[in-house]
């Protein structure tokens, strides 16, 4: 049986490399029509920590910038998503709970559909409040498994974490292979295990290309569901 695979466009190196202080929002909105015209992306990352930092460095209002950047994608029926650092929100240090709760309402009002929440420690306790806040704001809560390779980080470890996040209310799971070092076969097994328990839960795979595993990993996770 054929399976539909959807693609998400995620920007990273523009913000987290030596040239991270570009582009401005006026440049982003010029790029948006070309992305839409490509016709291959179901989702596009439009805001999150990296974006807001760039806006502020340029003296731009992040509220206006995010609205301008999400608008063309919504008009084309493309969902928008953002990155959320759990207890840290969009920052690199913890944010009070009341600020985090308000943050989701603001993001929803700006036009953000999905929040991808991750904790670098894979501590579900840090992610749990984000699930509640996102859903209360009317957003889709996508929770991440931060992938690495070690004797501790086994297929069973990640499967159990995913099942716990789904039990807490996560709408989707992201296999966040942040360094691209996840082993393709192991990633496929993680996806298969999640799908066996929750066939209808959407799973998104996020990879980096550096180590060279990502194309094999993409094939494995797609084959697994």
Predicted regions located by residue number:
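N-terminal amphipathic alpha-helix/helix-capping segment at the start of soluble metabolic enzymes
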Residues: 1-18, 66, 70-71
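Active-site/ligand-binding-proximal alpha/beta "capping" segment
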Residues: 18, 183-203, 220
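Short glycine/serine/threonine-rich phosphate/pyrophosphate-binding segments
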Residues: 18, 100, 124-127, 212-216
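A structural motif
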Residues: 39-41, 112-114, 170, 200
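Conserved, mostly hydrophobic/aromatic
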Residues: 14, 117, 173, 225
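Active-site beta->alpha loop and helix N-cap motifs at the rims of alpha/beta catalytic domains
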Residues: 33, 48-166, 180-184
